[in-house]
């Protein structure tokens, strides 16, 4: 299945990938992404650990319906969370792209 030296090479690749993944996870934790709702009237910025860093609300919304504002804040947070997830997937996919895996072998992410 692995051929001559194949398992050793696979282990070496796995160790290299593990180092790259650790570095990538550290980079992702430092990322900040902003989600928006209400055509940019509400903005929520979160980091790679999904911790909310900032909430910006256009002053014009403070005079409006409280429930609508709450919905816009939730939608902006969900947009930011979706964006950070997409960024994480893209960065992690780039780490594993160079590793030659046996047919049918899937990575856990």
Swiss-Prot record:
One Gene Ontology cellular component annotation held by this UniProt entry: bacterial nucleoid
Keywords: Cytoplasm, DNA-binding
Subcellular localization(s) per the UniProt record: Cytoplasm, Nucleoid
Gene Ontology molecular-function annotations: DNA binding
Highest taxon of the lineage: Bacteria
SUPFAM superfamilies in alphabetical order: YbaB-like
NCBIfam families: DNA_YbaB_EbfC
Function: Binds to DNA and alters its conformation. May be involved in regulation of gene expression, nucleoid organization and DNA protection.
Family per record: Belongs to the YbaB/EbfC family.
Assembly behavior: Homodimer.
Stated name of the protein: Nucleoid-associated protein YbaB
Organism the protein comes from: Salmonella paratyphi A (strain AKU_12601)
């Amino acid at each position: 299945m692995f051929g001559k030296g194949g398992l050793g090479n696979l282990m070496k690749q796995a160790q290299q990938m593990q180092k790259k993944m650790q570095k990538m996870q550290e980079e992702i934790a430092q990322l900040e992404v902003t989600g928006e709702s209400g055509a940019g009237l509400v903005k929520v910025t979160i980091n790679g650990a999904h911790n909310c860093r900032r909430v910006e609300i256009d002053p014009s919304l403070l005079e409006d319906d409280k429930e609508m504002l709450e919905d816009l804040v939730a939608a902006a947070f969900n947009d930011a969370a979706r964006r950070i997830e997409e960024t994480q997937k893209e960065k992690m996919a780039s780490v594993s792209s160079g590793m030659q895996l046996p047919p049918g072998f899937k990575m856990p992410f």
